[in-house]
Amino acid sequence: MRLRHLTLRHFRNVGFAALAFSGRQQFLVGLNGQGKTNLLEAAGFLTALRSFRTTDNKLLIQHGQHTGAISSELTHEQLGDTKLTIKLRRDGKELWSDATRVTRLADHLGRFPTVVFSSQDLHLVRGAPALRRRWLDLTLASMDAGYLRALQTYSRALADRNALLKRGNAADAELDAFEQQLAPAAVALLATRTAALALLGAKLAVAYDRLCAGDAAEKVGLHYEPSFDGPSTEAWLARFESSRGRDAQFRTTLVGPHRDDFSFVVRGTAAKDFASEGQQRSLVLALRLAQAEWGHEKSGTRPVLLADDVLGELDPLRRRRFWASIDPESQILATGTSLPDAELGEWQVFEVKSGEFEAAAETPEL
């Protein structure tokens, strides 16, 4: 997929910007706080109608404005030339595809993929389990409609069961009604997560090896940590039933896919506790490379890669290896406070200042 044009209106600190992209490499250069990340955020919003920086869409609308908009023109491997427009309001958003309003998330999710490389990705290694679950759910839901349906079913039934538990004195028959919905959905989520993390772990290891010059001592992977690994609906029903007393005590559901986690592993140990900062940064870069490769294999569509000033903390050799690891047919939009290394070929460069984007008079061969 190629992003040809991107237009922002009243988005973050950008009053208006219209950028035309040529070639596959665009670089946004400028000081911090000028709007580089805001443009990548807008491009990433195309994938799942959500920001990679915040869950509060009101923050996306420029201060003093009531609405905002993102418009894009893309060339897609299966869909051809397509125009997307996202209209933002303080109470919601609308998506339009070629002048037709899209009303179901399932009809859009994953069709126009992007993969974001962000400094916030370090939280996937260091942060709370909820961050890793959210990333995993978004990634799998964008690739697998069955996973999205199971996740939606599970989330609704979980909310209803928790409401009963919070109320107190829930009857077994009431709990059972929601457990009958939870159990088969949990089986589906567990199976998909298990297979996906095994595959992503293998791809992560290959990508990490490329970034780290084949250091065989640094064997890496992903380790799935389910709260319960029941193989069948019957096993899950029994587990939910046996947990009712404790769940009633704490007034919430204490077991299920919503309590799962996974960890990054280096040399057989948890990267969260034992890996250096350099290893952790390389792990999350490798994870995103693995995600992009797998997404292309699953959908036939190359995601647009969005790299938000993620390489500044890496040594020059590892930075060069990262750029060399990018699929040569993929488009990449990158940001930084200085231009990329000289041997990385020709970039279309935009200078960014105070929410304004100016194309370089001549794109230097950097």
Curated annotation (Swiss-Prot):
The keyword Ligase does not apply. The keyword DNA damage applies. ATP binds at residues 30-37. InterPro entries: DNA-binding_RecF, DNA-binding_RecF_CS, P-loop_NTPase, RecF/RecN/SMC_N, RecF_2. It is found in: Cytoplasm. The RecF protein is involved in DNA metabolism; it is required for DNA replication and normal SOS inducibility. RecF binds preferentially to single-stranded, linear DNA. It also seems to bind ATP. GO terms for biological process: DNA replication; DNA synthesis involved in DNA repair; double-strand break repair; SOS response. Its main location: cytoplasm. The gene is recF. The lineage of its organism: Bacteria, Pseudomonadati, Verrucomicrobiota, Opitutia, Opitutales. This is DNA replication and repair protein RecF. Keywords: ATP-binding, Cytoplasm, DNA damage, DNA repair, DNA replication, DNA-binding, Nucleotide-binding, SOS response. One of its GO terms (cellular component) is cytoplasm. PROSITE patterns: RECF_1. Pfam families: SMC_N (PF02463). GO terms for molecular function: ATP binding; single-stranded DNA binding. Belongs to the RecF family.
